[in-house]
A protein has these predicted regions:
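A glycine-rich, hydrophobic/aromatic-adjacent loop/helix-cap motif
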Residues: 377, 383, 399, 403-519
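Glycine-centered helix-boundary capping/hinge motifs
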Residues: 200, 389-390, 437
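Acidic/polar loop patches that form or flank catalytic/metal-binding clefts of enzymes
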Residues: 85, 204-205, 316-321, 395-396, ...
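N-terminal export/assembly segments and adjacent metallocofactor-ligating motifs
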Residues: 2-316, 324, 328-332, 336, ...
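Structured, non-membrane catalytic/scaffold regions adjacent to prosthetic-group chemistry
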Residues: 138-148, 154, 389-405, 409
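Long, well-ordered, tryptophan-enriched scaffold segments
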Residues: 267, 272, 279-405
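Non-catalytic, well-ordered alpha-helical scaffold segments
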Residues: 193, 300, 304, 397, ...
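Beta-strand segments within the central parallel beta-sheet cores of soluble alpha/beta enzyme folds
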Residues: 57-58, 169-171, 397-398, 444-449
Length: 519
């Protein structure tokens, strides 16, 4: 008995969506006049490709390694050396909560790994551009693997002899970010990087498409251990605030944030979930109690308005601030900095000799009041913040009070730090979590991206014959790698912001991506 499907014009819905998926373009089912219903074969009567998915020899555990990085576990059913079916994690008890093991079921990207493996568009044999043709003409001829290896090796030797090892660069955007051996991130941790280190090194990169600023800024505020509470701890939160975090679009799988948020909503229904985001995201629609729209890149001003309100109203724990913060009060700089023992070379407030470099008039207290170095900027009241952020002053006060009625978890996505002031945005979001006493407690967190629990696994770094040190001294921003190809001769300290290691051993990092650094 066939199933009935509504058709649109002369194309059935099934065919229409199949065509859209095949062409890789987004389409909308609007403006199509429905035609008469037609009989369409049932899904279970369609011919299977690659053999019977229930007839297999072995089952092997694998993982989805696309660029979201969630690494959802997958089971591969194999028959005669061919994958006949991909299945999700359905083993064990599915218990969500702190210390519990829950099933990490992949999204559609993981479930379609078999189609990816056997895609007719996948290049499975070496191809060489036809002699005499130009790049972009798309004319290739098949060659053997031995020919390909010899051609690549010969070309690499010629490049090294003429230009040196800094003419080699490893681009990380390969589409297999999460692989264990085939991983592409971080380039320094890949097998190819180890090979290049054996052969003299390569041009390195710093920063990345995702976390160019937050990666450097969070350790300056929270120290080296800045990871957030594990996501399952959200069942202990009274309030959950998401800044620029939309996992319904970015991390929707069973081992990622969106599924976990839905579980938190089910198990902790009394929790108030607030989404601070310029647009009404799918996450805000799906799980939030409240959406607070904000002008992009103004998170720092929002937090300043919140803290000024709490501070002026006497709602903050002053002793906590004096004990745990450096630079909030103008009268506590010297003692705080002298008592601090930097755990890394990237410590704000110290010069080459270890002396204090921050002027007392630049305290956060002075910034909030508009005094000292900030004279003339005005007091950072909720009304001031409202004019910058577009968030009403009363809403700013309500959000601030929410933090004092904790425990309140703060989780920021990577959108707030993708601005010219992104470093300050990311630190400000972490600051509102810390200054309200929500760090280091169950149901709270550091204000970074959601924390995850994981199991360590062996990596190529454990292989003793592969040296980890890259002897090439130049490191270029991954944003600027194209310039190193087109005209590396103009990349100097004046035009591309070169930084060099100084006599104290402290490496100077630019806050914003897009500069060149010598190390």
């Amino acid at each position: 008995m066939g199933k009935t499907a509504q058709t649109f014009g002369k194309i059935s819905r099934r065919s229409f969506l199949g065509l859209a998926g095949a062409t890789g373009v987004g389409v909308a089912l609007t403006g199509c006049a429905p035609a008469a219903k037609q009989e369409e074969p049932a899904a279970d009567s369609l011919p299977a490709t690659g053999g019977d998915p229930l007839d297999y020899d072995t089952v092997s555990w694998s993982a989805c390694h696309v660029n979201c990085g969630s690494r959802c576990p997958l089971k591969a059913y194999v028959k005669d050396g061919q994958v006949v079916r991909i299945d999700i994690d359905s083993d064990g008890d599915d218990e969500f909560g702190p210390g519990k093991i829950y099933q990490m079921r992949s999204c559609v990207r993981g479930r379609t790994n078999r189609q990816r493996i056997y895609s007719p568009d996948r290049i499975q044999k070496p191809l060489k551009r036809v002699e005499g043709t130009k790049r972009g003409e798309g004319k290739y001829e098949e060659i053997t693997w031995d020919e390909a290896i010899n051609l690549i090796a010969t070309t690499m030797k010629e490049i090294k002899e003429e230009y040196g090892n800094d003419a080699f660069y490893i681009q990380y955007g390969t589409g297999v970010l999460g692989g264990t051996v085939s991983k592409s991130w971080h380039p320094d941790q890949t097998m190819f990087a180890r090979l290049m280190n054996l052969w003299g090194g390569y041009l390195r990169q710093y920063a990345d498409y995702s976390t160019g600023q937050i990666t450097w800024e969070m350790p300056l505020f929270n120290g080296d251990a800045w990871s957030n509470n594990e996501v399952t701890d959200l069942v202990n939160s009274k309030n959950i605030v998401l800044f620029g975090n939309n996992p319904a679009n970015t991390r929707m799988s069973g081992s990622a944030m969106q599924y976990l948020l839905t579980q938190v909503r089910l198990q902790n229904p009394e929790a108030t979930i607030v989404v601070v985001d310029p647009h009404l995201s799918d996450t805000a629609v799906g799980v939030a109690n409240r959406w607070i729209p904000i002008r992009p890149g103004t998170d720092m001003a929002l937090v300043a308005g919140m803290i000024q309100y709490l501070f002026s109203a006497g709602k903050l724990d002053e002793q906590l601030i004096r004990d745990k913060f450096v630079g909030f009060f103008s009268d506590s700089f010297a003692d705080d900095v002298k008592a601090a023992e930097p755990t890394s070379t990237a410590f704000m407030g110290l010069d080459k000799s270890g002396a204090l470099t921050i002027d007392e008039d630049m305290s956060y207290e002075a910034y909030l009041a508009g005094t000292g170095a900030y004279a003339g900027t005005g007091e950072k009241t909720p009304e001031w913040a409202a004019g910058i952020t577009g968030v009403p002053a009363d809403t700013i006060r309500e959000l601030a009070d929410l933090y004092m009625d904790g425990p309140t978890a703060t989780i920021q996505g990577w959108g707030p730090q993708r601005h010219s002031n992104g470093g300050n945005n990311s630190r400000a979001i972490a600051m509102i979590a810390a200054i309200t006493g929500n760090v280091g407690i169950s149901g709270g967190g550091t204000g970074a991206r959601e924390g995850v629990g994981g199991v360590p696994f062996a990596t190529p770094t454990a292989i003793p014959c592969f040296p980890e040190k890259n002897t090439v001294g130049v490191c270029v921003s991954f944003f600027d790698w194209y310039q190193a190809i087109e005209d590396y001769t103009v990349m100097n300290d004046a035009t591309w912001g070169i930084r060099a290691i100084d006599e104290t051993g402290v490496t100077s990092y630019a806050e914003e991506p897009g500069t060149l650094k010598l190390r």
